[in-house]
Structure formats: C-alpha cells, structure tokens
C-alpha cells in the first residue's frame, strides 16, 4: 500500500493536505474502503464492478437482492436511506453515496483518471457516450426485471426479446463503424463496460444474436479479459451455488 507521502488524488498531494487540520476528514474518507451494494445477476452492478477492477480500487461488497424473498433485499427502510430508488448498484466512496451505474463510473473516471475509460479525443469520447446511452437508456431499462414483472409472466420473454433485438439493430450499426479491437477503436472504454453485461442479458432472455456479428465478436474478445472474468456474476458472493463457476 502506498504511504501517505506517495498518495495523490486528482493531482493533489494528500500528505500535504493531511498536515492541515481542516483536511483530515477528507483524508479519512479517501482512505476508507468503498462499499458496493451489488446484486449478482444485475448488469448495472456488473458495470461498476468492472470499472472498479480496471481502476484497481479495492472495495467491499454488500449483496443487495432485488428479490423480496431473499434476506438483505433492497426493499427496506435501511436501504432506502442509501438509495431512494431502492435499486442497485450504489457505491459508498470518499465519504459520499452514489447511485446509478453510469453516474458512478463517471465519478470514478473523474476522480481516478488512470487507467482511463474515456480517451482525450472529443469525437471518440462522444461516440463512447453515445454507445453507453444507447445501452443504458435505450435497451436495458426496457428489459429490466421490474418492467418484466409489470408486463406479466406470459408476455415478459417476448417483450424482452423484442426490445433487446430492436436496440441491438441500432447498436450493431454504430459498432460496425466505430469498433476496432474494442467498441471504439483499440482502447478499453466505458462502452465496453456496458456492452458485455447487456449481451449477457440478451442471452439470458434467449434473444437471437445471429444478426449482430460485431456485437458477438466484441463480446467474445472482452470476455477473455481478466477484469470481466473476475467480476462475472457467477463469481459473486451472493450467486447461488447452481450458477457459480466451479
């Protein structure tokens, strides 16, 4: 672990800050291990776990189920204080509680910019954000468990397949122009963090991926990276034994 004289935060030497009394609470917050409220199959939770892994941020997980029948579920007064929407993920870090996966990932990028998840080139940054929004605003919310529960069991699978396929049609076209080794060029980015969990959702709901060769290729490449393997839902502490990796 780095000593106080070695630690920096956004270019500020923390050792110098720590010597002033007003800054000691800030230093303590920065030195406190983050807590991630995560649910093992949640694609939103997986995004944040990957970002934390890429940034090499050590953290504790507090499993938070979205099933009311499981202990430690999100629908409690205690968790409502953490996340008023009672969804996952939430992250306690630097003395703050942050909710929503995309907001969390942006915070990590802005406070811990290396390794970078956004390039310096403004066009590439915009393209990455476009892909992130396409997935996180245009696809995943429409096949979220809370929506499918409202739709009803008889129609939920068809509903999920329809909206995933419709979203993937657009995503495939975007990626066919932007992709190199990864979603935008050859550098790992926020877009890749969002793609892999969404492909897992598509397979979970038995969507046909045959028409989307770029999506399939990128997913195969990305799944081989250690940051995705180590944070995979099947490796999580709250994953049921029948789904856990052997």
Swiss-Prot record:
Pfam family, any one: GST_N_3
Keyword Transferase: yes
Cofactors named for this entry: glutathione
GO CC aspect terms: cytoplasm; cytosol; mitochondrial matrix; mitochondrion
Taxonomy, superkingdom: Eukaryota
Cofactor note text: Glutathione is required for the MAAI activity.
UniProt cross-references to InterPro entries, sorted A to Z: Glutathione-S-Trfase_C-like (IPR010987), Glutathione-S-Trfase_C_sf (IPR036282), Glutathione_S-Trfase (IPR040079), Glutathione_S-Trfase_N (IPR004045), GST_C (IPR004046), GST_Zeta (IPR005955), GST_Zeta_C (IPR034330), GST_Zeta_N (IPR034333)
Pathway per the UniProt entry: Amino-acid degradation; L-phenylalanine degradation; acetoacetate and fumarate from L-phenylalanine: step 5/6
GO molecular function, one term: glutathione transferase activity
Location relative to the cell: Cytoplasm
GST C-terminal domain residues: 121-241
Catalytic activity, EC: 5.2.1.2, 2.5.1.18
Domain GST N-terminal residues, every copy: 32-116
Function: Catalyzes the glutathione dependent oxygenation of dichloroacetic acid to glyoxylic acid in vitro. Possesses low glutathione thioltransferase activity toward 4-hydroxynonenal (4-HNE). Has no glutathione thioltransferase activity with adrenochrome, phenethyl isothiocyanate (PEITC), 5-hydroperoxyeicosatetraenoic acid ((5S)-HpETE), prostaglandin A2 (PGA2) or 2-hydroxyethyldisulfide (HED).
Entry similarity comment: Belongs to the GST superfamily. Zeta family.
Name by which UniProt lists this protein: Probable maleylacetoacetate isomerase 1
Organism: Drosophila melanogaster
